[in-house]
Amino acid sequence: VIGLGLKVNNGPTEWASGTDEQMQDYLDSFDWANSMVLAHNTMFDGAILNWKFGVNPKVWADTLSMARSIHGTGVGGSLKALSEHYQIGQKGTEVLDALGKRREDFTDNDLSRYGDYCINDVELTYDLFSLMGGKYPRKELKVIDATLRMFIDPVLELDLELLESHLIDVRDRKEKLLLNLEDGVGKEDLMSNDKFAGLLRGLGVEPPRKISPATGKETYAFAKTDEGFKALQEHEMYEVQALVAARLGNKSTLEETRTQRFIDIAKRGNLPVPIRYYAAHTGRWGGSDKINIQNLPSRGPDGKTL
């Protein structure tokens, strides 16, 4: 950790930088049990505060989450975009000069400039909260806190042995499916929209459709950017995932990469649940960190594992 900026209520913002031990002593001097911690993208800052320094406040708050629910995609969620929208100041660019640097790489002058940059970020975040938080529903602040805690203070334990066994099973099933495809299905069948649609129907899945912008007529939604086709990559039937992966030329299915990701996490500890508050215009949560915890299979052998 290079340093941190901290503001208590409307007092002056402090910049702190030092060894891990010095930073721990500094943070231990605050009454977190009776405090709310605010940041912009608190999932990131909160994880560092909790995982490295044991900070566990009464409430976590996040101006990024609040902004998504207020502005959607109309303004932008970055601190820079929001600060310009509310005309409260300008976000600095010193962080770009610090990419790849450790604390010991900074000169005294560089560290001082970086501290000023951090202080400015804190002031902008505080001002944003003052502007957006006045009429913000308290019950939604509680929802934001609960959402953040699922990542910052993880409690879900993963069964490493079961996951490793599941990964072997998934890969075996994929190999068998691809062998069966190779016996009766060629690359041209996978790339032909009509024949690929027939393969999907053979698995009991109706192919997704869309209106072609070129012809104005209905056609199959098999482009890799089509929402319906992307949904097939996350289909609860593994056979569908494997079929789509084969068409795309991918070596791994979503089930494989997701299971491997869970295995890597299990070796480190509990599962932080990375979901974003108000990720869509409907207000629903969205997945993050390449793990959509909301889209795990619920039926079949995969549903018993994931």
Locate each region found by the language model.
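Conserved "right-hand" nucleotidyltransferase catalytic core of DNA-directed polymerases
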Residues: 1, 74, 99-305
